[in-house]
Swiss-Prot record:
This is Peptide methionine sulfoxide reductase MsrB. The gene is msrB. PROSITE patterns: MSRB (PS51790). Zn(2+) binds at residues 48, 51, 97, 100. GO terms for cellular component: cytoplasm. It is an enzyme of class 1 (oxidoreductase). It comes from Herminiimonas arsenicoxydans.
């Protein structure tokens, strides 16, 4: 596994915009249908906004209709971790970057095949790295 990224609160505040900071460091949730990647269709890799760890591939992205980017699998399961989230009187499974502990979103058991999972991820927790389409001439 990649070495843990640990920063002070002041360092996180200096490198992230307000929404990125609130989402990743304080588990806030951006409004649905508002994030830059909920309706994004380019080919590439979505990385952690805090530490650049590769998290999700565009090939695993699907339109769940929920207003947040949704993926049926993580790019590398070792790069994300899950924990029980009991906030707001609900029991959900929170998804966190395993390298820097950034809050990413939640995972639900209502996704498509082949996994049946829906990683519902805040755009504010992600950066996108485009990769060339190998099928193009």
């Amino acid at each position: 596994m990649t070495e843990k990224v640990i920063k002070t609160d002041a360092e996180w505040r200096a490198m992230l915009d307000d929404e990125e900071y609130d989402v990743t460091r304080h588990a806030a949730t951006e409004a649905p249908f508002s994030g830059r990647y909920w309706d994004h269709h380019e080919h590439g890799i979505y990385t952690c906004v805090c530490c650049n760890t590769p998290l999700f591939a565009s090939d695993a992205k699907f339109d769940s209709g929920c207003g947040w980017p949704s993926y049926f699998t993580a790019l590398n399961p070792d790069n994300v971790k899950e924990k029980i989230d009991r906030a707001y009187g609900m029991i959900r499974t929170e998804v966190i970057c395993n390298v820097c502990d950034a809050h990413l979103g939640h995972v639900f058991n209502d996704g498509p095949p082949p996994t049946g999972l829906r990683y519902c991820i805040n755009s504010a927790s992600l950066r996108f790295d485009a990769t060339p389409d190998l099928n193009e001439s």
